[in-house]
UniProtKB/Swiss-Prot annotation:
The chain crosses the membrane at residues 401-421. The GPI-anchor is attached to the protein in the endoplasmic reticulum and serves to target the protein to the cell surface. There, the glucosamine-inositol phospholipid moiety is cleaved off and the GPI-modified mannoprotein is covalently attached via its lipidless GPI glycan remnant to the 1,6-beta-glucan of the outer cell wall layer. Extensively N-glycosylated. This is Cell wall protein ecm33. The keyword Glycosyltransferase does not apply. Residues 399-421 form a propeptide. It is found in: Cell membrane; Secreted, Cell wall. The keyword Glycoprotein applies. It comes from Schizosaccharomyces pombe (strain 972 / ATCC 24843) (Fission yeast). Glycans are attached at residues 22, 29, 92, 197, 203, 231, 236, 264, 275, 300, 324.
Length: 421
């Protein structure tokens, strides 16, 4: 009897040693529930966890039991049949949490997950709901691309490097009420009626808002890079506390827009572009004094009111269809420093030529000649919003997995389109 008890003790100890070994010998490649079950005793998994169905096993449901922490990446990809994946105990992932190319997945349960190194959800065309029940409060990057989500629920961050929501055709609301600081924000190619709320956002590097119906960034004070609005159904854009934009500013193809309100904006380090047919007056910038690149204003406006503007380092292109327009600047004054000067009304078709290429604009402080004179590129302009099409990034997961790289391509295409029409 004593020997039997001793043998059982040894067996139990051996099992614990084996379990500990299983938990620290990653990476782990999983394609079946049985393989996952071998990790049930692991509370902490050391190494990357890869879950895929590349072998077309036909498995439809997987549950990752027991694991509370992964010291590495979690990558779930390329499953043709997997519809449901559950991490009932998972609380944190030190690396990336990536789920992509799962065309049938309609359930992704992560009820305890609060912290990841980065979050990437891409090409999940049947995923309708996020289940971050405990609240995802820590992630350096969030990329959500090509899903059927209607809202971004359960994500509450106060700072983030990249926040990208693209190609989600059913999404109606993107709300990040606690977000105060971000390096790169890209909202584009989603549902036409999407509403965006970043009510506490005070600092951003670059932000693109494309195809939105409502936006609240009323507390934004600093934009160190670019700030773009395009293809929107907004009737008003108001950013009352913003004082400086480090690089370029653009408002494009938003025909319902009737007013702009930037009462404290003094400086734009790069190009300044407005191409909209709904504005009857270019105003709302009462204290802007310096534009580090070119100034491009296209549309149906009858007046321009920028009373403090004294220094435009690049070229000027102003064209409007209004017949009662009077240009507030002349080629002889000292405001426009660039070589090209176009400022005219009664234009039947907005189609001018300029040597200024906004896509090459950089901050005036960089010392580049581009910011002062523009590049030697011939471009033309059009104020017809119908000529523009919304820039949509690829539905391939590679675009989303590259984070803001895809966003940069979208921004570039928008700017090139604005200047090439």
């Amino acid at each position: 009897m004593l020997f039997k008890s001793f043998a059982l003790t040894l067996l139990f100890a051996a099992a614990r040693v084996q379990a500990a070994s299983n938990c620290s010998s990653g990476p782990y490649n999983i394609s079946a529930q049985g393989t996952l079950d071998e990790l049930n005793s692991c509370t902490v998994l050391n190494g990357d966890l890869y879950i895929s169905d590349a072998g077309n096993s036909g498995i439809t449901t997987l549950t990752v039991n027991g694991i509370e922490s992964v010291q590495g990446d979690v990558v779930v990809s390329d499953g043709q049949y997997l519809t449901s994946l559950s991490f009932p105990s998972l609380k944190n992932v030190s690396g990336a949490f990536n789920v992509n190319n799962m065309i049938r997945m309609n359930n992704l349960a992560t009820p305890e997950l609060t912290s990841v190194g980065s979050l990437n959800l891409a090409v999940l065309p049947n995923l309708q709901e996020l289940q971050f029940n405990a609240g995802l409060s820590d992630s350096d990057s969030v990329v959500i691309d090509d899903t059927q989500l209607q809202a971004i629920d359960g994500i509450s961050l106060d700072s983030v490097t990249t926040f990208q929501v693209t190609n989600n055709r059913y999404i109606q609301e993107i709300t990040m009420e606690g977000l105060e600081s971000a390096q790169n924000i890209q909202i584009s190619a989603n549902s036409k009626g999407v509403s965006v709320n970043f009510s506490k956002l005070s600092n951003v590097t670059t932000a693109t808002f494309d195809g939105i119906s409502n936006v609240f960034i009323g507390n934004l004070k600093s934009a160190a890079g670019n700030l773009y609005f395009s293809n929107t159904t907004l009737d008003n854009i108001s950013v009352p506390y913003l004082t400086e934009i480090g690089q370029s500013f653009a408002v494009l193809y938003s025909p319902e827009l009737t007013s702009l309100n930037f009462p404290n904006l003094t400086t734009v380090g790069g190009g300044f572009v407005i191409n909209d047919t709904g504005l009857t007056s270019i105003d709302g910038f009462p204290v802007i004094s310096e534009i580090g690149g070119g100034l491009v204003l296209l549309g149906n406006f009858s007046s321009i009111d920028m009373p403090d503007l004294s220094d435009v380092k690049g070229a000027l292109t102003v064209e409007t269809k209004a017949t009662n327009f009077t240009c507030p600047w002349s080629n002889d004054d000292s405001v426009i420093k660039g070589d090209d000067f176009t400022c005219q009304g009664s234009v039947a078709t907005i189609s001018a030529t300029s040597s200024y290429d906004l896509s090459s604009t950089v901050s005036a402080t960089s010392g580049s000649a581009t910011s002062a004179t523009g590049s030697a590129t011939t471009t033309s302009y059009s104020s017809d919003s119908s000529a523009s099409s919304s820039s949509s990034s690829s539905h391939e997961s590679s675009a989303a997995s590259n984070g803001f790289t895809a966003g940069a391509l979208v921004l570039g295409s928008l700017l090139v389109a604005a200047l090439a029409m």
